[in-house]
Amino acid sequence: MQRTLKSLTVAAGLALAVGGASYATSPAHAGTPKNMMVMAMSISDLITLDPAEVFEFTGGEVIANVYDRVMMFEAENLTTLVGGVAESYEVSKDGKTVTLSIRPGQKFHSGNPVRAEDVAFSLRRVIKLKKTPSFIFTQFGWNKDNVDSLIKPVGGKVSITINADFSPALMLNALSAGVGSVVDEKLVMSHEKDGDLGYGWLKNHSAGSGPFSLKTWKSNELVMLEANPSYRHGGPKMSRVVLRHVPEPSAQRLLIEKGDADIARNLTPDQVNGVAGNADLVVDNNPKAALVYIASNNAHPILSKPKVRQ
């Protein structure tokens, strides 16, 4: 079975693809340059920008804008899987092997072309580094000893073999996760030290092909992203986006009311209601993907029953 995928076209039209929930925006851009967007938000959870390691909310948002992933979801419909770096795929009759065709003409921020070799390198690298989010891939039976033989670039395509009892549909969905981000192998490996696959360098730099590149990251201070005018869907509307570390929601509200920030990301429900009547501000609501953990006391005679958990 061969499937040709629709390409994601939304990201370039937005200033930045952000997570969901409610946030307040200032349409006037009073105190900020017209070609730059400033977000007031907490970035205290940002500890790395290597897509093989990122597993926090802020880092996830940053790499979603810096890297294209093998597969992606429609921004306006998070149930629709679309093509990212891959433009089509073919599934073998036994359902064990998926062959990805890589979209031609894509370029990294460095100017290097996006190749099938980059895709294979990026996926293998996640397994070999074995950072926290690698479990998203290891469930498919991939490990450092077999991944080179199970994920292979072949003539502009990438062959991926599943080594466990999982549907290829689940694997394709997994390729839309942060670990599915495609990194520039040539650039990353030029910074390799002691066999670290460029990990020490990529924690604080970027090597992607997305609508933005990383210009600056100062821990617990700011992240500055710069538009990629050569992005495959066209350059973003904003030349720069700044994520300014403002941990206190009250300070975020003050900045947006003064026009010193364009978006406040972490307002409390009461604060959102408080600014809703301000004619100079807009409160936006967007869907947000989230994990919900439910814990139960299995020592309880009722809760211990399997049918309750089912």
What are these regions (language model features)?
Residues 40-93, 124, 205-209:
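N-terminal lobe/hinge region of extracytoplasmic solute-binding protein
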Residues 74-76, 177-236, 240:
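Gly/Pro-rich hinge or "lid" segments in bacterial periplasmic/extracellular proteins
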Residues 35, 273-285:
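Ligand-binding "clamshell"
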